Amino acid sequence: MGKDTIADIITSIRNADMNRKGTVRIASTNITENVVKILLREGFIENARKLVENKNKKEFLVLTLRHRRNRKGPYRPILNLKRISRPGLRIYFNYRRIPRILDGMGIVILSTSRGIMTDRAARLERIGGEILCYIW
């Protein structure tokens, strides 16, 4: 785990999905909880629960991933995640310039002045912000 918590979340979920793991354990912060709420609401993950370790009182989120199989049987990852804005290069858009991912099939997660939200919610509220990641 590094200093970029969003990149850590994305990497953990992507690695677990590619290795066909059912669950992922990530550190719990305000940002990670908000991103996980969006993933739950949009249906990219099945379940999320908070876990507290008794030894050192650290809080973790345990995510249950949603998997998909093709008709012929081979495994196909359901999540494609891409980190856009990073600590070394912040990327901001106003609400008119927020990109659409696969014509609305994917989502863009933004950090706005009103909290972390999806691209659809930001367009409805007519506010822009920092583009955190793309998920499709």
Swiss-Prot record:
Keywords from the UniProt entry: Chloroplast, Plastid, Ribonucleoprotein, Ribosomal protein, RNA-binding, rRNA-binding
Any one GO molecular function term: structural constituent of ribosome
Coiled-coil blocks: none
GO cellular component, one term: chloroplast
PROSITE patterns referenced in this protein's UniProt entry, alphabetically: RIBOSOMAL_S8
Quaternary data: Part of the 30S ribosomal subunit.
Entries under InterPro entries matching the protein: Ribosomal_uS8 (IPR000630), Ribosomal_uS8_CS (IPR047863), Ribosomal_uS8_sf (IPR035987)
Database matches in HAMAP family: Ribosomal_uS8_B (MF_01302_B)
UniProt keyword annotation of DNA repair present: no
Protein name: Small ribosomal subunit protein uS8c
